[in-house]
């Protein structure tokens, strides 16, 4: 029997669903391009692989910044980097490091010092963590073209999935066999030796379905010593075991090879942005690894509008990584999850409760050697690194009126980091640390109209250091966990032809983890900054100007700074521009009920210089880029696109490193963006 009364259930669910569907409708109207090879069936009902409409309805319940990025939003152009995926996702700063899959990914200033890999964001794939147990992550574990959509929960809005970090969570969701059967190939190619091929296959029957993708990617790169290649297999199969139980298994296998050209000085960037860092080139620096992953997600419908979600995952990674030393690592990562969701009446009010726990742990064998032209020399370190985390969380939403919903939540996290030093010639540097904290959350949702919501929350975040911080310098850094309290106020909705998502936030951060490099790029370790402030404004908008003409944009204002620091006063934290804008104008004339072709003009604008060092003596320059995309649905299931990027061939800094004090001198901290480039792609799907 349904525990909701009809009125109570409509109070809590109806507004969220109607608002999310309205947003979906405008998103489709405002991006009318025909290149939709990764079409998702919004009508499918499979608990272990919910559709995009269900994800939007869930996001509409959240009293904070969220987004759902459909794969069709970026499939009409080159789809290679996280910058391609999140180009128009409000609040997400994603910049390629050297035109390849490595990126600088940050939300609300998360992981500011990390110009490599990722920290400060809880990454999941199909609801199962792919972030490693110590909090670090890789970008090559995701194939953008093998996704149906991506969920973004900014900041503490990731609480109901176990995310505790300042940046929040990102969940990459794979298609299931219900998203369309048959074989679907796609190929892309273009400048700098870029080549990518993908084929997917899927099918569904009454009680089972499967989906698989196989991709291969290679590029020579804009810069010297920036060749990349990888091969990736992703597959999942779902089984309806009974009327109330569904289980889905996921398999991933990938091999990644990346040359690392490193950072160069500002003068070198202006003279020849294609050159590699001399030290990187001499050390033949690269990052190669193989990864294998197994996961399961099982959903049990308990009746009375309640369900139990169970997840489990295991991954193995073998890494060979010549940088300032040669790192050779073999890691085993494990995670489990249990999540209970119930919707019922509480004192006559509609109520939704989420309870969950997510333990994770890993074991890393880490051996280090002198780098002799990219090969192993004499050993310099040997260790065993063990991480474990246990996060328990609870969140309750109570609809106190037809327009107002109050939200309260809490998390408890216990994390352990153990470093066993097996190379004792330079002394025993073993480490055993425990980090624990409770993080509360209070928020509200105000349904101003059917299509307009105002929200706000006050919430805490908690982030223990990863081994990248603890062992990333010349020795072991004894660090405290980073924690913060964030106040957020925002609005999302649709009026006529306009859809918007605006959020302002202010975070007081304590013991922020800031990594330092020397002027030559050598790692100097990580420190805790006692007090910092992260203030920002995140904006996304779409406008259907006419039936054929649409505009969409995203804007980030970021004011991250020290708070009365003894050395740096109130200086802005380096590494991310204060203002960052992307926009595109698309013309897609309709023929009948579908668009046959499209033309898109786009721009990327960083209008002000920003600091590279904490002392503010070295800066990255502003820039403006322009691009053009055209595409056509050629009939018989075929579509194609042609895209030009950086058409003015602007020399610019895509992102930078972070150093303490450049003392007014130039330093090798600049990562050039790609020059003028042209890409093309073609795909086919069965009718």
Regions found by a protein language model. Name each.
Residues 37-77, 103-106, 121:
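N-terminal periplasmic "start-of-domain" segments of outer-membrane beta-barrel proteins
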Residues 63-66, 83-128:
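Extracytoplasmic beta-strand/coil segments of soluble accessory domains associated
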Residues 112, 121, 128-154:
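Short acidic/polar hinge/loop motifs at secondary-structure boundaries
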Residues 182, 189-218, 223-261, 286-302, ...:
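Transmembrane beta-barrel wall of Gram-negative outer-membrane proteins
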Residues 307-320, 447, 453-459, 481-544, ...:
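Membrane-embedded beta-barrel scaffold of Gram-negative outer-membrane proteins
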Residues 350, 357-447:
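Signature of Gram-negative outer-membrane beta-barrel scaffolds
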Residues 401, 406, 414, 506-508, ...:
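Gram-negative outer-membrane beta-barrel transporters
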Residues 605-612, 632-687:
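C-terminal beta-signal and adjacent terminal beta-strands/loops
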